[in-house]
Amino acid sequence: MTVKDLFLNTPISKKISVKGWVKTFRANRFISLNDGSTFHSIQCVVDYENTDHEILNNINSGASIKITGVLTESQGKGQKIEIKVEKIEILGKCDPEDYPIQPKKHSLEFLRENAHLRVRTNTFSSIFRIRSSISYAIHKYFKENGFVYVNTPIVTGSDAEGAGEMFKVTTLDINNAELDSENIIDFSKDFFGKETNLTVSGQLEAESMAMGLGNVYTFGPTFRAENSNTSRHLAEFWMVEPEMAFCDLDNNMDVAENFIKEVLKYVINDCKEDLIFLNERLINEDKTKPLKDRNELNLIDRLNFVVNNDFVRINYTEAFEILRSSKPNKKKKFKYPVNEWGVDLQSEHERFLVEKHFKKPVIIYDYPAKIKAFYMRMNEDGKTVRAMDILFPGIGEIVGGSQREERLDVLKERISELNIDEKELWWYLDLRKYGTVKHSGFGLGLERLILFATGMTNIRDVISFPRTPKNAEF
């Protein structure tokens, strides 16, 4: 049985066996045992006088053991049930002298350095159970709403974002590779016969699938060779990317908002104990901060607030005017001033809008074309595109999406303006030649949603083994 089974279907007075890792061993009598199936540990009461002392000497924090005994109602405070131990088997010893995860509070930085062991702490086991629940809820939402799950390539020859910040994939010996007539590495000699990279997005391929299946989504790892060593960026992260045929920007925003709310609603119900623990953790953390830096709502209240309230929707021009006339901008508190229409909104601007001005999630739409990707549908004004971003408190941008440009001539013109090689996108242009339709989609960064759901502040703490500049340990 798992520890979770014991709490859900309590077989009082029955003999049971459970395996797990020792959290603590107090007074040579009380073992706190956890197997990862639930936040709660089960207390196991040892008969010290009648237990082999060699076994007792090996019951240390981190050791894996098998407990056999009778489940009883607890005689002490703090737990409803406990196991009266009849037999202990040591499955894996753990030397207390050099085990890094001691039963005390560790800094998050220390735990990042020991990412292979940090899941054994209460904080990280809760985070990763919530991550699992969110991932399940994502698939559940799309399945129930008629979407087809598709897989898009990890190795690709196209740059969906047009940013060029991609990891190259090659079998060539770079130090001895053949050069072409322009003194550039000749990738025609490479495995794929051309330059290839790890994907930055599955969007373009998902668009192709949507043109035959209707509504589709892809959910997988993406890679950005962006040299951003911040608490908000990863080089490898997970993206959820739905694409919808016969869908305009308004429909797209409706789906994105509903999707986020339904996923969070599922997690609130599925991960109650983990959220209660993380909520208490954040309340205690808040007490150490100045009053002005404390959260107005606790974690669980924030999640319920998002689920139960409409997101604000404003266009870019409205957002620009709010920011331009804001106190931080007038007093030059923004690192990036907002003075000219067309400026790309930074995280500080996004967070001001959601945390100070509206105090709720915000969807900004109709962005200037010059700061957005080539595939976004041009508006009639010729200056803005049918793009949208969803901004969350504490996070900034959590979703980016758009209505895609379905008109072949307009798309070709845009590709030319941005000096993108049209030959590389021949197949993408084909989608506009043969039965083109209005279509839209968006991308949600899984880790950013998990940040919001757990109250964590560093994106490296919500993925098992973070990949960041100069760091590919584990």
What are the roles of these predicted feature ranges?
Residues T2-A245:
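Class II aminoacyl-tRNA synthetase-like tRNA-binding/catalytic domains
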Residues K87, E318, R448:
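Ca2+-coordinating acidic residues in Ca2+-binding motifs
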Residues F128, F246-D250, N309:
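Short, charged/polar micro-motifs that form catalytic or ligand-binding hotspots
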Residues A160-M166, T171-D186, N258-I390, E417-V437:
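Metal-assisted phosphate- and nucleotidyl-transfer catalytic regions
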Residues G193, L198, M211-P221, L234-D248, ...:
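TRNA-recognition modules of translation machinery and tRNA-sensing kinases, especially anticodon-binding
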